[in-house]
Design a protein with these regions (language model features):
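Catalytic Walker B motif of ABC-type/P-loop ATPase nucleotide-binding domains
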Residues: 153-157
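Conserved ABC transporter NBD signature motif
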Residues: 55-74
């Protein structure tokens, strides 16, 4: 079973430590909320977990049955949804999905049309993403993350821009995902991580001068 272990990790920008001496372990069936005020370093930690930015100290290890997975293979295992990750604006919805599945196939042989029904956007399949509303974009990003055949789900501000119906959809989807994946939610909004019993508060890993 996949695990992600953090051993005394630290990240700084210029001279400012964003977090330091952070040790933690993530595993399946134990969703974790990364919490802390605006600007505390939640997104920075999420990006470090994804291997998208380097850390300055310590070690992040992905391992399966004690076998270490090389850094360059982490991306195959993870799905990441975040407001700052871009969609390809020129593509239609159907083109976006077909492009995505070339790199990250859907789990359980799900078809594009089934997927479009699940994200409740089938009637917009030929619309360019550049004409999508913010909530439609968010459902597309979340849907791709939930339904790709990956084992780690990184969700940064998952319900931003979602209305109540979209929020309820998110909760039902994430509850399914928890059973099969390592789920990590970064958030300022308690109701979007209500299913997380354990919290990682970035403020606990700030350096006291
Ligand atoms: N590339 C960068 N270069 C320099 N400083 C950065 C960089 N990225 C982030 N920071 C700084 O790191 C700190 C943490 O930012 P981060 O975006 O991780 O916070 P956050 O907890 O996700 O905030 P929010 O809740 O507002 O989304 C901030 O002070 C930010 O300005």
């Amino acid at each position: 079973m996949l695990k992600i272990s953090l051993e005394n990790i630290g990240k700084k920008f210029k001279n400012e430590w964003i977090f330091r001496n952070l040790s933690f372990e993530f595993s399946r069936n134990e969703p974790i909320a990364i919490i802390g005020p605006n600007g505390s370093g939640k997104s920075t930690l999420m990006q470090a977990l994804a291997g998208a930015i380097p850390i300055n100290e310590g070690k992040i290890t992905y391992s399966n049955q004690e076998k270490t997975i090389p850094d360059e293979n982490w991306h195959e295992l993870l799905s990441f949804s975040a407001p700052y990750l871009e969609l390809i604006e020129e593509f239609t919805l159907a083109e976006s999905v077909n492009f995505h599945v070339k790199f990250k196939p859907f789990q359980n042989g799900l078809s594009t049309s089934d997927f479009l029904q699940i994200i409740e956007l089938e009637k917009h399949k030929d619309k360019p993403v550049k004409n999508f509303s913010s909530g439609m974009r968010q459902k597309l990003k979340l849907g791709l993350a939930f339904y790709s055949q990956t084992e780690v789900l990184l969700l940064d501000e998952p319900t931003s821009n979602l209305d109540q119906k979209g929020f309820d959809w998110y909760i039902s989807q994430v509850e399914k995902a928890i059973k099969n994946k390592i789920v990590i939610v970064s958030s300022n909004e308690p109701k979007e991580y209500i299913f997380c019993e354990k919290h990682l508060n970035i403020l606990d890993f700030k350096i006291k001068a």
